[in-house]
Amino acid sequence: MNIFNQLKQDIIVASRQLYNNQEIANTATIEIPKDSFNGDLSSNIAMIIAAKESIAPREVALKFKEVLITLPYIASIEIAGPGFINFTIKADSWQASIKDILQHEEKFFEIDIDKSRNINIEYVSANPTGPMHIGHARGAVYGDVLARILQKVSYSVTKEYYVNDAGSQINDLVSTVLLRYKEALGEQITIPAGLYPGEYLIPLGQILAKEYGNKLLTMNYAERFKIIKSFAVEKMLDLNRKDLADLGIKHDIFFSEQSLHDKGEIEETVKLLERMGLIYEGTLPAPKGKIHEEWDNRVQKLFKSTKYGDSQDRPIEKADGSWSYFASDLAYAKDKIERGANHLIYVLGADHSGYVKRIEAIVKALGKEQVKVDVKICQLVNFVENGVPVKMSKRLGSFASVQDVNHEVGKDIIRFMMLTRQNDKPLDFDLVKVKEQSRENPIFYVQYAHVRTISILSKAKELMPESYNNFESGKYDLSLLSSEEEIEIIKLLASWTKTLEASAKYFEPHRIAFYLINLASKFHSMWNFGKENSDYRFVIESNKELTLARLALASAIQKVIASGLEVIGVEPMNKM
């Protein structure tokens, strides 16, 4: 029995019975109180009903108490504050969670929220102009783990990478590769400021020189540009794909911005918005304060972004008449929606925080308020190597690449560490700490817990083979898991699916990492307590019945840790 789901269902039934209202009960929450003094679980159902029925919350809470106290798994109910209903669950109901995890594992870990949601999540979308730096890795891991979580709770998810292959930075890439091509032909070159001086483009020039000789130099500009652009973008994308694959990340779709131009999708989108009355000719408001010399006060085509909450309307054309980047964004969102997505998630870096409102406006307009949109910002990673910050600039040619850091510490450490802070908070990535074998290193602490559970089971199998066979046959008495430490761990195990649901609901993958760290901490504490008091050891040869129960507990811990690590794309370690 999933206690959280069972209590929610019983509250819905009680709501229908008491107030003939089931729908509003679906919005009620079941939470774990921060203070254990307030019981095991708490619900706000009384306050929700009270607001709807114009009744005092405590009066509603008392009526719910009368009905719910009769449930077989409820030990007691208390009314707190303005009307919170606090539940204390009977120990045997918590203990039964262990049996669910071990004997009904697939059902316990299965979560089915809403299969009607078709989510498109776009993340990384780094310009294909060079190797990915560690800052990109944070958004990559966040987006990938969020997609995994959403899939885990039964949403249909498309993972997408938007290839920015139509902007000025691509022109700079082409110019740089052309110089490297000339260099490969024997010409002395200088990389001007603003281009890409990194050595990673040298091999591209050499490949072109080998394939074309000096033929590219005899071509006209347009023909040469087209060949170099196609070649360079594909090579850089191959590089990015490999960097991502080495992190355990694979997108379903790589979508080309250039394709929007080539297929006329931008023109089509603009015409649609014109028919909707959302495009007009006007001027942009002057910037606040001192007017910048680059401010463009010409009459131009603008999208009515302010109608949907943006701070200003947005231009869809540049001064030279070409489409703006914003116009591409309009067409791209339309394309996603036409492919069937009814919920768009954008994962952006900290340097794009100003894009949130404009993206929301785009989707609200094109989705006609029927398509959900969420824009998540990943803050900077403060990467330190020997106490010296690493420059993160592809233009300077000196940066901490994903490949470098992956080679240094491995993908599992990168993935886990990127989730040790909420995505909208800056993250310190300490290369020294992530290599330590101590509780100060969170991924080591979690992996060590997994290894220890396997060690416990192996030890029991070796020392007590008959008892181990009984454990595997499900012959254990879970009522023996009655100490405060054991019940606390069991409650945490029972809350695993609740944590997963909350991570999906609030788009917060860090909750999984925090949960695993918490579970590992409680397990290690009990293990260490067993060193001081033999009664708390997991394997006690003189007490077969208690050993059987604790083997069940250890196995449940192992399965939940493995499930959590699997969700975040980290391989559980079986030995160290």
UniProtKB/Swiss-Prot annotation:
Monomer. Transmembrane segments: none annotated. It is an enzyme of class 6 (ligase). HAMAP family: Arg_tRNA_synth. One of its GO terms (biological process) is arginyl-tRNA aminoacylation. It catalyses: tRNA(Arg) + L-arginine + ATP = L-arginyl-tRNA(Arg) + AMP + diphosphate. A motif ('HIGH' region) lies at residues 128-136. This is Arginine--tRNA ligase. Pfam families: Arg_tRNA_synt_N, DALR_1, tRNA-synt_1d. It comes from Rickettsia conorii (strain ATCC VR-613 / Malish 7). It is found in: Cytoplasm.
